Swiss-Prot record:
Record protein name field: Ribosomal RNA small subunit methyltransferase H
Taxonomic source organism: Burkholderia ambifaria (strain MC40-6)
Function recorded in the entry: Specifically methylates the N4 position of cytidine in position 1402 (C1402) of 16S rRNA.
Compartments, record wording: Cytoplasm
The keyword Translocase belongs to this UniProt entry's keyword annotation: no
CC terms in the record's Gene Ontology section: cytoplasm
Gene: rsmH
GO terms of biological process kind: rRNA base methylation
Length: 313
């Protein structure tokens, strides 16, 4: 319960107000977390409405199972499974999809989960600790090239190659020092390599972000769920996505723009604009947390919410 109290849902009212356009519709919360958005959606739904939520984190599932509401169900899986999971429930169309990306405060604040460089803990970083390869396991086998690519591409870290070499050098000392399996040591290694300091940011921030994204396949899953959401939305249905770093937001922005624009056609061809198929999406807005929300919850500072609506059947 303590962890739930520590988590403040970002852009709560704005997201739910943008999402729920039909109280008797079927909605999807792709990232249940500690249930802030889901509970607010349920409060707006009519008796005939339904909400299906997804989460990989077993602790999120435990929290969700305490919601006693016949309109609500939870799926213990990545939101990338959305299309198949809804099909298995006989659902072909939904009125809205909400995605609140990234890690939740309880995940970051619990050293045992291995997401944070601020407190020492096991080097795990999996959203679902019961499935897949942990960060420590991946670091124990990844090549310098793979490490460099992940840290550079997912962390936008300009010292990626130097960090990768340091990690592989540390691995060569495993017989003497034991495996690299704590967040504290990883942060220390990165701190020795990254000599420049960004104001208000720990030198390990970008590397931890990169490894977390890789371990959880976050960007690949995001692309899958955006495609699924587009096919699942009914006409008038809303896609609401909250991102917390530029990599996620760039994918969401480009996806919405691509599907809200008419297809490109060679001007030399005898085709009129009115004869082209209409784009399936209309971009509604982009929103940021208010100053008051950022003061109350500093982790909201980097959030950006994008909203699009399905305009074709």
């Amino acid at each position: 319960m303590g962890n739930e109290l520590q988590h403040r849902t970002v852009l709560l009212d704005e997201a739910v107000e943008s999402l729920v356009t039909r109280p008797d519709g079927i909605y999807v919360d792709g990232t249940f977390g500690r249930g802030g958005h889901s509970r607010a959606v349920l409060a707006r739904l009519a008796e005939a409405g339904r909400l299906i939520a997804f989460d990989k984190d077993p602790r999120a599932i435990e929290t969700a199972q305490r919601i006693e509401d016949a309109r609500f169900s939870i799926v213990h899986d990545s939101f990338a499974s959305m299309r198949d999971a809804l099909a298995a429930r006989g659902i072909e169309k939904v009125s809205g999809v909400l995605l609140d990306l990234g890690v939740s405060s309880p995940q970051v604040d619990d050293p045992a989960r291995g997401f944070s460089f601020r407190a020492d803990g096991p080097l795990d970083m999996r959203m679902d600790p019961t499935r897949g390869e942990s960060a420590a396991e991946w670091l124990a086998r990844a090549s310098v090239q793979e490490l460099t690519e992940v840290i550079r591409d997912y962390g936008e870290e300009r010292f990626a190659f130097q960090i990768a070499k340091a990690l592989v050098a540390r691995r060569a000392e495993s017989d003497r020092l034991g495996p690299l399996d704590t967040t504290g040591e990883l942060a220390q290694i990165v701190g020795h390599v990254v000599k420049t300091r960004e104001k208000g940011k720990d030198p390990a921030t970008r590397t931890f972000q990169a490894i977390r994204i890789h371990v959880n396949q976050e960007l690949a899953d995001l692309q899958v769920v955006l495609d699924a959401a587009l096919s699942l939305l009914e006409q008038g249905g809303r896609l609401v996505v909250i991102s917390f770093h530029s990599l996620e937001d760039r994918i969401v922005k480009r996806f919405m723009q691509a599907h809200a624009s008419a297809p490109a056609v060679d001007r030399r061809l005898p085709i009129r604009a009115v004869d082209l198929p209409s784009p399936p999406l209309k971009i509604i807005s982009r929103q940021f947390p208010s100053e008051a929300e950022v003061v109350a919850n500093p982790r909201a500072r980097s959030a950006v919410m994008r909203i699009a609506e399905r305009v074709t059947p």
